[in-house]
């Protein structure tokens, strides 16, 4: 289950959204919204209110002359006052 969650995305926009209890993660592209919600609720013992997902399109790299694969990004909204604790 840990392999399905790859890492947290930390950009300027995602750091600003932490104030409104929204966390951004890169996850496995085969997961759907209900599976993502169950995984986060089990791992971090929090209540997930909303799950938004988006897939980045394939892009062509001129340096390596091949396509970069797409990835799936998820934005989670959790209850106010709850934090995701990373160990």
UniProtKB/Swiss-Prot annotation:
Binds to 23S rRNA. Signal peptide: none annotated. Its main location: plastid. GO terms for cellular component: chloroplast; ribonucleoprotein complex; ribosome. It is found in: Plastid, Chloroplast. It comes from the Eukaryota. This is Large ribosomal subunit protein uL23c. It comes from Bigelowiella natans (Pedinomonas minutissima). One of its GO terms (molecular function) is structural constituent of ribosome. HAMAP family: Ribosomal_uL23_B. Keywords: Chloroplast, Plastid, Ribonucleoprotein, Ribosomal protein, RNA-binding, rRNA-binding. Part of the 50S ribosomal subunit. Pfam families: Ribosomal_L23. Belongs to the universal ribosomal protein uL23 family. GO terms for biological process: translation. InterPro entries: Nucleotide-bd_a/b_plait_sf, Ribosomal_uL23-like, Ribosomal_uL23/eL15/eS24_sf.
């Amino acid at each position: 289950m840990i392999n399905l969650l790859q890492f947290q995305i930390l950009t300027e926009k995602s750091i600003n959204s932490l104030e409104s209890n929204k966390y951004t993660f890169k996850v496995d592209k085969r997961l759907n919204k209900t599976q993502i919600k169950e995984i986060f609720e089990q791992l971090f013992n929090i209540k997930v209110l909303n799950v938004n997902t988006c897939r980045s399109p394939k892009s062509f790299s001129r340096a390596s002359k091949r396509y970069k694969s797409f990835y799936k990004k998820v934005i989670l909204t959790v209850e106010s006052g709850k934090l995701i604790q990373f160990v």
